[in-house]
């Protein structure tokens, strides 16, 4: 009986955690993408809005900055432990 109670409590806590963490996201399909509401017909460079048209979405992708570690990998050295042996 104690085992069933413990398992049910663990299941409830896990479900609660999963539900609350998924609700924290606005839209799980927009990872790395930001959307701004822009009136349709707007020149995005001059920000001239025409209010009689419906709103559109302008999507801006966030580009990661900084050094790419894959470009700075040195070739394996024969004396190292990870060197492939024949």
UniProtKB/Swiss-Prot annotation:
Glycosylation sites: 67
Modified residues (Hydroxyproline): 64, 67
Keyword Secreted attached: yes
UniProt signal peptide: 1-24
Presence of keyword Zinc: no
Impact upon substituting residue 67 to L: In cle8-1; defective embryo development
Region annotation (Disordered) ranges: 43-86
GO biological process: cell-cell signaling involved in cell fate commitment; embryo development ending in seed dormancy; maintenance of root meristem identity; phloem development; positive regulation of gene expression; regulation of cell differentiation; regulation of endosperm development; regulation of seed growth
GO annotations of cellular component type: apoplast
Keyword list, A-Z: Developmental protein, Differentiation, Glycoprotein, Hydroxylation, Secreted, Signal
A single GO molecular function term of this UniProt record: receptor serine/threonine kinase binding
Family label: Belongs to the CLV3/ESR signal peptide family.
Protein's recorded name: CLAVATA3/ESR (CLE)-related protein 8
Organism: Arabidopsis thaliana (Mouse-ear cress)
Lineage, top ranks: Eukaryota, Viridiplantae, Streptophyta, Embryophyta, Tracheophyta
